[in-house]
C-alpha cells in the first residue's frame, strides 16, 4: 500500500490577502474573462489552504458572474470523496499540490481530459498532463538548504552527490511518506533507472543526520541549528521564514543559504501545484474558464506574490524574496512521470531504509 504524507499548510495572513485583493480588483478591464458573463456556479475541491487563493476566486466571480463554492481538505481525502460520490459528485474542479497527487486522481478516473488553447499555450508541456487531464498552476523547486557556517556552496552540486560518503550524517529531509520526496525519487527513477536510483537512495539514507521527522520548515530549522549541514526542501519554505514577522524565523533564515542542484546538467527538480476538471463536472465549461483564468497574467502574479511560488506563465514577475534566490535551470522531465513512477519509487525508498 502506498504511504501518503500529510501536507502541512501555512496561511499567508491578512497582509498578503489584502495585496492580492487590491491588485486583482485593478486588473485590466479589457481582460477576455471580464468580457464574458454567463453566470452559474462551479464547485472547487481544493487541497490548497491559503486565504489569498480565496481572493483569486472572488475576483473570478466578479469578472465572470460564476460563483465559486470551495470545499477544502487534504488531497487524498478529496480524491476519495470524489470517488465515493461517483456520478453524483458536485465537484467541477480538483486543485492540489504535487503532480504525484494529480496523477493519483487521474488514475482513479476522477479527472477528464480537456482541450484548451489558452492552457496549452500558457502552461509548458512538461508541466501539464499530455492528454489534458491536469495542468500546472505554479512551480515549486526542490532545492538544497545549507548551513552557511558549515558548508561552502562550492561543495554542493547535484541531488546525486547527496549520496556521497562525504556527507555522512549531514543530510536532513522528510520521511518517505512525503509526496515531495516520492516525486523527487520518481524523477530520478525516470532519469537513471531503478538500479542507480536505489543505489542513490541507500547512500542518501546512510548520510541522514537524524531519522526523518517534520516538514520542510523543520528541516531548515535543524540545518540552521547544526543538526545537519544540508537540508532538502521546497524553495518557498525558506522564503516564508525570510518574510516572517517573527524575529526567530528570520534568524533561522539568516544562517542558511539556498542552492539550486544540477545546474550544469539537466536542472533542478520542478514540481507543481495544479488542477484538473472532474469527470462528469456539472459545469464543465465554467470549470475550463476557471482554469484559464488561473493562468492569466494577474492571477499568476498573485500566486507568485502570495505564496512565493514560481508562475507557470512566462514573463510574470516573482516575489522580490524569490528573485534574490537567483535564476535557475529547471529540469524538462514531464511532471506526469512523478506519479507514474510513484509506486516503484516507494518500493525503492522502503528497500533503502528511508522511513
From Swiss-Prot:
Membrane topology of this protein: Peripheral membrane protein
Job of this protein: Plays an important role in protecting the acceptor side of photosystem II (PSII) against oxidative damage, especially under iron-limiting growth conditions. May also be part of a periplasmic ABC transporter complex involved in iron import.
Tagged with keyword Nucleotide-binding: no
The protein, known as: Iron deficiency-induced protein A
GO cellular component, one term: outer membrane-bounded periplasmic space
Species assigned in the record: Thermosynechococcus vestitus (strain NIES-2133 / IAM M-273 / BP-1)
Molecular function in Gene Ontology: metal ion binding
GO annotation, biological process: iron ion transport
Amino acid at each position: 500500500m502506498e504511504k501518503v504524507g500529510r501536507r502541512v499548510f501555512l496561511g499567508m495572513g491578512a497582509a498578503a490577502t489584502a495585496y492580492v485583493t487590491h491588485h486583482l480588483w485593478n486588473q485590466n478591464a479589457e481582460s477576455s474573462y471580464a468580457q464574458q458573463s454567463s453566470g452559474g456556479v462551479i464547485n472547487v475541491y481544493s487541497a490548497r489552504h491559503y486565504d489569498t487563493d480565496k481572493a483569486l476566486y472572488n475576483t473570478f466571480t466578479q469578472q465572470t458572474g460564476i460563483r465559486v463554492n470551495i470545499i477544502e481538505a487534504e488531497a487524498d481525502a478529496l480524491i476519495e470523496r470524489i470517488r465515493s460520490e461517483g456520478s453524483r459528485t458536485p465537484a467541477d474542479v480538483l486543485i492540489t499540490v504535487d503532480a504525484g497527487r494529480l496523477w493519483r486522481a487521474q488514475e482513479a478516473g476522477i479527472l477528464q481530459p480537456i482541450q484548451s488553447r489558452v492552457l496549452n499555450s500558457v502552461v509548458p508541456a512538461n508541466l501539464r498532463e499530455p492528454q489534458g487531464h491536469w495542468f500546472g498552476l505554479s512551480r515549486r523547486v526542490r532545492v538544497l538548504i545549507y548551513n552557511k557556517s558549515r558548508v561552502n556552496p562550492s561543495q554542493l552540486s547535484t541531488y546525486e552527490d547527496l549520496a556521497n560518503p562525504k556527507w555522512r550524517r549531514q543530510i536532513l529531509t522528510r520521511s518517505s511518506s512525503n509526496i515531495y520526496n516520492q516525486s523527487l525519487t520518481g524523477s530520478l527513477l525516470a532519469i537513471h533507472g531503478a538500479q542507480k536510483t536505489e543505489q542513490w537512495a541507500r547512500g542518501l539514507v546512510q548520510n541522514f543526520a537524524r531519522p526523518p521527522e517534520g516538514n520542510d520548515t523543520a528541516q531548515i530549522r535543524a540545518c540552521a541549528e547544526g543538526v545537519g549541514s544540508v537540508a532538502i526542501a521546497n524553495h518557498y519554505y525558506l522564503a516564508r521564514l525570510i518574510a516572517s514577522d517573527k524575529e526567530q524565523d528570520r534568524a533561522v533564515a539568516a544562517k542558511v543559504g539556498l542552492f539550486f542542484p544540477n545546474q550544469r546538467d539537466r536542472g533542478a527538480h520542478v514540481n507543481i501545484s495544479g488542477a484538473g476538471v472532474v469527470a462528469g463536472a456539472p459545469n464543465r465549461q465554467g470549470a475550463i474558464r476557471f482554469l484559464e483564468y488561473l493562468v492569466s497574467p494577474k492571477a499568476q502574479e498573485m500566486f507568485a506574490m502570495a505564496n512565493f511560488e514560481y508562475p507557470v506563465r512566462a514573463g510574470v514577475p516573482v516575489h522580490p524574496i524569490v528573485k534574490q534566490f537567483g535564476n535557475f535551470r529547471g529540469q524538462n522531465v514531464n511532471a506526469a512521470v512523478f506519479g507514474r513512477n510513484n509506486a516503484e519509487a516507494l518500493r525503492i525508498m522502503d528497500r533503502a531504509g528511508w522511513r
